[in-house]
Amino acid sequence: MSENNSENASAQTPASFPATQQAQNEAKIDGNEAVNRAAEAWKDAASRNLPPLGLGEVPVPDDTANLRQGPSLHDGLLGLLPLVGVWQGEGQAHNSDGEQYAFGQQLVIAHDGENYLTFSSRTWRIDAEGKATGPDVRETGFWRISPKDEIEMTYNSSNGVVEIFYGEPFNERAWQLESASTMVTETGPKNLGPGKRMYGLMPNNNLGWVDERLVEGEMRPYMSAELSRVAG
């Protein structure tokens, strides 16, 4: 495996994050008003959750992506609470080979009552007519956050990438992360540099995220998407 560190990666907020300034302004609204807006926007998703596996009982709780169902969220995760759910939408990619394409994404962020979140993303390519053409990259990983609001995210992808990200909340509705270690297998993307990600709730309560990568000494867009809550 090859490794790149993020010493040269800028600590600035990703410039292409959807509606970043609007998201900051939205974060300043009264807490009760924010809850009311979210409840109205997500009422159709409120009763949905991950389907049970149905393969027999195990002595640990099932994962839940709905804070109203299953085990209570661990107190240590309150700083990441708004992320929990099943999200789905579309985005744009500029991969390490220079190819640009549209993609669809389903992102599941769940918990089982322990002090971490599970992270599962699956993407599919979309053609010029908006039709899905087949599976793309999958990611699985975990989020943790310390009492000092220090975030750790680890993940591995189906195309041979393993990364460690560190970060912190940008505000109550956004989280910024920067890669500390980027490892690529022999068959993985050769030109993938260190990067940074930002996730945040937008004014419409959708989840926006952007991944930027270091290319020839500057941060450039890699992937970004806007996702609607479909469960949780």
Question: Which residues does each PLM region occupy?
Answer:
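Well-ordered beta-strand positions
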Residues: 81, 110-111, 144, 168-169, ...
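Central antiparallel beta-sheet cores of small beta-barrel/beta-sandwich binding domains
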Residues: 97-189
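Residue-level recognition of well-ordered beta-strand positions that form the cores
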Residues: 86-92, 120-122, 142, 154, ...
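A generic structural signal for ordered alpha-helices
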Residues: 58-65, 121, 145, 177, ...
